[in-house]
């Protein structure tokens, strides 16, 4: 028993020292840091004073009284004085926590109005009222209880506790009035702070998403429109004189005859950024877009990679008519078929120019764009790209690259992967293909068709190709880039309806300018995000900081103070509990728990407020400079 008493005394002494030092550091931080000397922190200053007094008189005196077998040996006056100070400080702590909760609540709910109202003088008056009410209440009830009741002092000489505890109804009424009512008010305010903080956070997230969407829409990307059906083929006249042209430089190549093998790997897929308009493009009567021809050659080129794919051109055209207009901005890749294979090393004629590889580029709608377009039955069909090259087995036939718009994204992705493998093989054999001359003929066609299959989600190619206008070659041939501007239903020569792409030419300089504008818009968006972050720190962070402060302070307050008031209420109604050692032990523990809140509060400030944390850390390191 003696060892336990010594250990308890040492622990309580340590707890008292920690309480005094911690709260003195909080008070000192007000003197050292002007940023802490704000009206909202006056309540924390008041709470630190009450905790300091508990560390000076509450913990050591009650420990001595408990170790002396709950016998008071210092007289009645000191007993009443100690009880008065102890209860006044404890109730002042309760009301101070209530003041902190109310202050944080109005700081979040009505920030502008409350900040104008919350002047230093008014906050000081509130703190004075917080201390004045407990002082009057407990001074009168403790010192004057015998006088008001007419019974005089009813305690023995060795007893020391408040006399109104002997009246269970008065005792319970006082506890309900100044603790339980206050506790429920604080919980209600805490719930209001939580809802306000959550609402501000949700509003901030919605603004951020809208900002991201606007930033995405500002980028120069592909916009695909679907117009109403009923348009005929005369809606797009064969006139491209007013269209600006976007050329991709490609070195010459020739066509040679090869044996047909299994399907190889098509060329890679590149991503192309363009904003499209409803300009016109030359169409043939068979809905073919005529590309610039290449010079004829005696040899013919038959690539098995494209021959097998060309057999798939027999797919039926879609007869579905769009019924609404949808605009979508997304990044669409370009398909650039480049024939390359190990067996093509002799495909060039020595009289031809070197590096001629006509690249056919057609942006297509990616999977994300397709998924966003699905809104009606007539719009649920999306497009992907299938490439084939029609090969003539005649002596002077020319290779005709064909692009078919289909709706099977999985097959298109597989073809795109094969394109990448052919691209790698072509790079390996590039030195062997350094021949002079131009290819004979080579009319480029684009045939548009739709299958009845629905698109399936797939990953889009992540590769990009940036064309630089600086690398010019006299032998280079400029091949125009085809940019999709509108998808509409037209009537074919057979009377059926097919979907046709109205295309236009865009110049490379315009694309370069758009790239620069894109970078500029990204920088502007970053600046806007930075300003958004600053605004967020002034509004949403205020609510989050208030919620964090109240969570630590109010949470520790409820956990540590509630047990005492529960047992104290029972103590007034239970006569047998007073003589029960186990109940008295629980009562003593609950009393100590109330004291335990005082050394924890400084750490709660540090965890809830970064400015307090910085200043307290500086104080404990021995830095007492005033800033």
Swiss-Prot record:
Tissue spec. comment:
Expressed in putative sensory neurons, many cells of the ventral cord and in the HSN motor neurons. Expressed in some cholinergic motor neurons and GABAergic motor neurons, which are the two major types of ventral cord motor neurons.
Any single GO molecular-function term of the entry would be:
G protein-coupled acetylcholine receptor activity
Segments carrying the region annotation (Disordered) are: 222-266, 423-442, 449-475
Top-rank lineage group of the source organism: Eukaryota
Q: Where is the composition biased (Basic and acidic residues)?
A: 459-475
Q: Which regions span the lipid bilayer? A: 10-30, 42-62, 82-102, 123-143, 173-193, 550-570, 587-609
The biased composition feature labelled Low complexity covers 231-264
Q: What happens when the gene is disrupted?
A: Egg-laying defect whereby 30% of eggs are laid at an early developmental stage. Increased sensitivity to the acetylcholine esterase inhibitor Aldicarb, which results in accelerated paralysis likely due to enhanced acetylcholine release by ventral cord neurons and enhanced depolarization of muscles on one side of the body.
State which ranges are Cytoplasmic (membrane side): 31-41, 103-122, 194-549, 610-627
Q: Which GO terms describe its biological process?
A: adenylate cyclase-inhibiting G protein-coupled acetylcholine receptor signaling pathway; chemical synaptic transmission; G protein-coupled receptor signaling pathway; G protein-coupled receptor signaling pathway, coupled to cyclic nucleotide second messenger; negative regulation of synaptic transmission, cholinergic; response to xenobiotic stimulus
Q: Topological domains (Extracellular): residue ranges?
A: 1-9, 63-81, 144-172, 571-586
Name the protein family. Belongs to the G-protein coupled receptor 1 family. Muscarinic acetylcholine receptor subfamily.
Function of the molecule: The muscarinic acetylcholine receptor mediates various cellular responses, including inhibition of adenylate cyclase, breakdown of phosphoinositides and modulation of potassium channels through the action of G proteins. Primary transducing effect is Pi turnover. Regulates the activity of ventral cord motor neurons. Couples to the G(o)-alpha G-protein subunit goa-1 to negatively regulate cholinergic receptor activity in the presence of high levels of the neurotransmitter acetylcholine in ventral cord motor neurons.
Q: What is this protein called?
A: Muscarinic acetylcholine receptor gar-2
Native species of this protein?
A: Caenorhabditis elegans
What broad taxonomic lineage does this protein's source fall under? Eukaryota, Metazoa, Ecdysozoa, Nematoda, Chromadorea
């Amino acid at each position: 028993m003696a060892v336990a008493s010594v250990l308890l005394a040492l622990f309580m002494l340590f707890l008292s020292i920690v309480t005094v030092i911690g709260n003195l550091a909080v008070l000192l931080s007000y003197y050292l840091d002007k940023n802490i000397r704000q009206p909202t922190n006056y309540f924390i200053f008041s709470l630190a004073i009450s905790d300091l007094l508990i560390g000076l008189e509450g913990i050591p005196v009650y420990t001595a009284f408990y170790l002396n077998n709950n016998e008071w040996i210092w007289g009645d006056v000191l007993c009443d004085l100690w009880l008065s100070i102890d209860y006044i400080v404890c109730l002042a702590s309760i009301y101070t926590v209530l003041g902190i909760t109310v202050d944080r609540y109005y700081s979040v709910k009505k920030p502008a109005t409350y900040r104008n109202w919350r002047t230093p003088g008014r906050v000081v008056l509130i703190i004075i009222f917080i201390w004045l009410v407990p002082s009057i209440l407990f001074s009168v009830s403790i010192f004057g209880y015998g006088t008001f009741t007419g019974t005089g002092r009813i305690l023995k000489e060795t007893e020391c506790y408040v006399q109104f505890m002997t009246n269970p109804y008065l005792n319970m009424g006082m506890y309900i009035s100044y603790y339980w009512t206050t506790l429920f008010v604080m919980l209600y305010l805490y719930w209001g702070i939580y809802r306000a903080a959550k609402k501000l956070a949700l509003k901030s997230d919605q603004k951020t998403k809208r900002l991201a969407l606007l930033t995405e829409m500002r980028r120069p990307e592909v916009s695909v429109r679907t117009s109403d059906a009923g348009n005929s083929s005369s809606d797009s006249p064969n006139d491209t004189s007013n269209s600006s042209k976007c050329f991709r430089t490609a070195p010459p190549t020739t066509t040679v005859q090869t044996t047909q093998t299994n399907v190889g790997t098509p060329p890679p897929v590149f991503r192309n950024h363009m904003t499209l308009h409803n300009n016109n493009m030359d169409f043939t009567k068979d809905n073919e877009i005529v590309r610039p021809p290449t010079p004829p050659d005696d040899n013919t080129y038959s690539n098995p990679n494209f021959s097998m794919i060309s057999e798939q051109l027999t797919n039926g055209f879609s007869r579905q008519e769009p019924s609404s207009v949808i605009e979508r901005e997304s990044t669409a890749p370009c398909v650039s078929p480049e024939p390359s294979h190990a067996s093509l090393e002799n495909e060039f004629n020595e009289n031809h120019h070197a590096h001629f590889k006509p690249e056919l580029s057609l942006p297509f709608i990616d999977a994300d764009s397709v998924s966003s377009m699905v809104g009606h039955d007539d719009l649920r069909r999306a497009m992907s790209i299938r490439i084939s090259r029609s090969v003539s087995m005649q002596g002077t036939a020319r290779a005709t690259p064909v692009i078919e718009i289909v709706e099977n994204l999985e097959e298109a992705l597989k073809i795109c992967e094969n394109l990448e493998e052919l691209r790698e093989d072509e790079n390996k054999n590039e030195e062997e293909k350094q021949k002079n001359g131009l290819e004979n003929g080579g009319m480029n066609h684009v045939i548009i068709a739709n299958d009845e299959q629905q698109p399936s989600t797939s990953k889009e190619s992540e590769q990009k190709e940036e064309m630089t206008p600086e690398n010019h070659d006299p032998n280079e041939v400029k091949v125009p880039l085809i940019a999709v501007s509108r998808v509409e239903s037209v009537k074919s020569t057979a009377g059926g309806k097919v979907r046709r792409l109205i295309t236009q030419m865009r110049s490379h300089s315009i694309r370069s300018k758009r790239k620069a504008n894109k970078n500029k818009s990204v920088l502007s968006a970053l600046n806007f995000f930075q300003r958004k972050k600053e605004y967020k720190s002034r509004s949403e962070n205020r609510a989050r900081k208030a919620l964090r402060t109240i969570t630590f302070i109010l949470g520790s307050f409820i956990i540590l103070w509630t047990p005492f008031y529960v047992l104290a209420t029972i103590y007034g109604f239970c006569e047998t509990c007073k003589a029960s050692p186990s109940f008295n032990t629980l009562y003593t523990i609950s009393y100590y728990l109330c004291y335990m809140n005082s050394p924890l509060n400084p750490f709660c400030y540090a965890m809830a407020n970064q400015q307090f944390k910085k200043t307290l850390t500086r104080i404990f390191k021995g830095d007492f400079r005033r800033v």
